[in-house]
């Protein structure tokens, strides 16, 4: 969405690309059910620059806050006046609250991370069925993986991160039957499999999965990802990221609606 005139939208989403995102549809439906008259729009920014951030706020004088998705969850932190401790620990922000004075002038941009809460509550039923001492494997080492690790930590579950490059605790080649016996919960925190690239998938050794294993994908579009399909074919329990999306969205809205 390229703006050239003033908007009256209340909330929004910045990132690139945004064609796959269901956030606008979720909030539009919610506001219609509430009868609040509020609105939510996508702002697809090709680059996150000072000019882009300034334009976002200037051309949207009614904007109370916005969500942040890939690839800007880390970069946006450079433009904020304060960052919530949980977001600091994760090293990524997915929610920005805009504070204004009585004249509408922006007084502060404050960053939060509601991905942690969203994933924590989505994965809780799986985490609660883990045997004492069992850990989780997190596929990926980006900002999403850090939110997943923080959420699991809050549930008392240790985790290991997996990457191609060796930036994580393990590489994909390190995953063995013994590793999965110790880590029966696997989380795909990569964007692989997201629409329109639905055939893509992490190079995970699916043949080592079986009944009793649990696989949670953060991707929600499509509803069944290639990661989920392959895991389910081996008898593993699977779940997509739609509940996480809804929970983090509601947590973001609560932040925006809370008076400073």
Regions found by a protein language model. Name each.
Residues 2-128:
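Phosphate/diphosphate ligand-binding glycine-rich loop within oxidoreductases
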Residues 15, 113-116, 123-127, 132-153, ...:
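Glycine-rich adenosine-cofactor-binding loop
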Residues 68-75, 144, 191-194, 221:
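Short glycine-rich anion-binding loops that position phosphate/pyrophosphate groups of nucleotides
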Residues 99, 104-105, 157, 210-213, ...:
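A short helix->loop->beta-strand "cap" motif at the edges of active sites that frequently abuts
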Residues 121-125, 234-260:
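Active-site capping/gating segments
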Residues 154-172:
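NAD(P)-binding Rossmann-fold cofactor-contacting core
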Residues 168-239:
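Rossmann-like adenosine-cofactor binding region
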């Amino acid at each position: 969405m390229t703006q050239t005139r003033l908007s009256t939208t209340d909330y929004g989403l910045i990132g690139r690309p945004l064609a796959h995102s269901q956030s606008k549809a979720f909030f539009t439906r919610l506001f219609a059910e509430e009868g609040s008259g509020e609105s939510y729009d996508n702002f697809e920014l090709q680059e996150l620059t000072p000019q882009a951030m300034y334009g976002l706020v200037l051309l949207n004088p009614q904007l109370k806050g916005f969500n942040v998705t890939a690839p800007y969850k880390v970069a946006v932190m450079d433009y904020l006046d304060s960052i919530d401790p949980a977001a600091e620990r994760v090293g990524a922000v997915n929610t920005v609250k805009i504070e204004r004075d009585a004249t509408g002038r922006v007084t502060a941009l404050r960053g939060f991370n509601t991905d942690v809460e969203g994933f924590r509550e989505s994965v809780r039923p799986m985490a609660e069925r883990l045997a004492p001492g069992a850990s989780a494997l997190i596929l990926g080492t980006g900002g999403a993986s850090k939110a997943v690790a923080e959420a699991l930590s809050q549930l008392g579950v240790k985790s290991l991160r997996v990457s191609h490059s060796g930036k994580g605790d393990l590489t994909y080649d390190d995953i063995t039957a013994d590793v999965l016996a110790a880590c029966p919960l696997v989380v795909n925190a990569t964007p692989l499999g997201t629409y329109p690239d639905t055939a893509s998938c992490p190079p995970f050794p699916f043949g080592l999965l079986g009944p009793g294993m649990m696989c949670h994908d953060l991707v929600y579009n499509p509803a069944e990802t290639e990661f989920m399909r392959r895991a389910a074919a081996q008898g593993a329990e699977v779940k997509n990221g739609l509940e996480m999306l809804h929970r983090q969205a509601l947590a973001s809205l609560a932040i925006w609606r809370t008076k400073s």
